[in-house]
A protein has these predicted regions:
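Flexible loop/turn segments at secondary-structure boundaries
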Residues: 24-28, 49-51, 57-59, 115-118, ...
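A generic secondary-structure signal marking the coil-to-beta-strand transition
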Residues: 39, 104-106, 180-182
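Conserved, mostly hydrophobic/aromatic
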Residues: 41, 108, 137
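Carbohydrate-binding surface patches
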Residues: 88-131
Length: 189
């Protein structure tokens, strides 16, 4: 996350090599989810550096979904205006987003590094949207989170609270672990 964040100061998203690697990682042996690795890799050239033949059927389905997502949003991600939202060098999260030229569509990547119990509720202010537009926000391009104006999303922010803030969930992907991520798809109505 820090490497990609820092690289974004010198290179556009379309120039950054960003791939889903094997887990545990072969250099530092950290074990992160396929979802997190994909969510980070979207904001670069996107590819895979692992033996697909060693993945489970469930993991292969997830890879197919990641490829579908990237094909659907490639133009936006590669050519949109990039905004840095949370600096991983100064906090426990990294976040960035890309916004289309007409400001009708955006993809937000939010990445929490280490999980802590009883964290406060958090909001993250977005950037580059049309203040007067009405937007629908979906989590991971599936679950609708709500409808908000651009002004709400940029001034009050987007709820980034994880389930360590007192809520409990055993649903896969809904509970917060170390190196946890969430994508938000923001589209004008």
């Amino acid at each position: 996350l820090r490497i990609q964040y820092g690289t974004s100061y010198a290179y556009p998203v379309s120039f950054m090599g960003s791939h889903v690697s094997i887990a545990p990682n072969h250099q530092i042996f950290r074990n992160t989810s396929l979802k997190l690795r994909g969510d980070v890799a979207y904001f670069g050239t996107f590819g895979y550096e692992l033996d697909l033949g060693k993945l489970s059927a469930k993991e292969l389905d997830e890879v197919r979904e990641q490829i579908r997502f990237m094909k659907k949003y490639r133009k936006l991600i590669q050519q949109g205006t990039f905004y840095r939202l949370k600096d991983p060098f100064t906090g426990n999260a990294a976040a960035w987003m890309v916004v289309s030229d007409d400001r009708r569509q955006a993809i937000v990547g939010y990445y929490k590094m280490l999980a802590h119990p009883c964290t406060p509720y958090t909001w993250m202010k977005l950037a580059g949207l049309d203040e007067a537009a009405d937007y629908t926000v979906r989590i991971d391009d599936r679950e609708e989170m709500g409808q908000f104006t651009g002004a709400e999303l940029m001034r009050a922010g987007l709820d980034t609270t994880d389930f360590s803030a007192g809520e409990q969930s055993r649903e896969e992907g809904r509970h917060c672990t170390d190196f946890w991520s969430r994508l938000f798809v923001v589209e004008a109505k």
